[in-house]
Amino acid sequence: MISFREMKDREYIPHKTYLKLLIGGGLSLSKVLLTNPGDLKKLRTIHGSEERYVRPKRPYELPPFKEGMRYGVTEEKYLRHTLYCNPCAPEVVALAHHLGAFQKTDYEFAKTAFEFVKEKLDLEICPMDPVEETIRRGTGTCFHLISVFIALCRCAGIKARYKTFAMNMIQTWYDAMVGSDQLVKKWYDQMGFFMMEGEGEAFIDGKWIVAHVGPTAERQAAGGIPITKFGESSIGVWFFAVPGTTETMESIPYGLGAGANLLKMIAPGSMERINISIQHQNKMGKKIIEDAGGKESYDAMTRKKLGSKTPIVDLSNKKGIIFGE
């Protein structure tokens, strides 16, 4: 049984900013549900004529784990086991060795891990579960995918942490992620932002290097933005951080998966519609990349005309949460 002191040391206990986000998100969702009972009844399930979500096939084989495989995990901060993120799990250790752990430089390995997670694992809105389940499944939320990157780095002896922030998003992703379901759209518009988004960071050669592993190249192409590389942040390109909400932490805090858990319990149909929309985005982006002549051509072309804008959301009456700089 983990002690309260250890929970606090490993940052399982939510920070003040996160608690504000969690409470504000819960109150906003409650208000949406209480004032829109008709929408909840209509949207909570998928009806017979609607498209159903089919999880994409995992595009990689699970490398075999062998006893005695080396791993660099210690009890040192940013190298140890944290909530949902066990760098000693056999699936993590085997995958880390498959990607070149202890054979490549720290930078080369972290970059390889970034590219694997970003391009091989796909976004799926689902409840939080351990990192090894994400590797077996091949899908997960942004925090599932970030946890895979962090676990791989820690397994290879590279310190890694989470960077979190409340965010709003570029218009195309707003349309796909939020506009696909009226209940989720009303929740987002009530708050003016989504509760929490994040990125991974790896400590290499004395500095923290950001790793935005959430979107595949195809989803970024569907959004009309460049394909982010290792060391490039999503903030200002894919997402826009709400001022005063950016934090770094060793672990996912308790309660982070509450939104997805609540959505699945109350309105599983809404969750399924979002996941269907994500797969439509992947298909759209794949064609855009093919028409552009490949990922490199698309990326070079898009970087020349970068100019994404946030969705227009009226925040004039959003008085529930105020964040300091």
Model-derived regions, located:
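N-terminal accessory/pre-domain segments preceding catalytic cores
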Residues: M1-K111, I125-R137, R154-C155, F230-E325
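Short acidic/His/Gly/Ser-rich catalytic and metal-binding motifs that mark active-site loops
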Residues: L123-C126, Q171-W173
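Secondary-structure capping and boundary motifs in well-ordered enzyme cores
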Residues: R137-L145
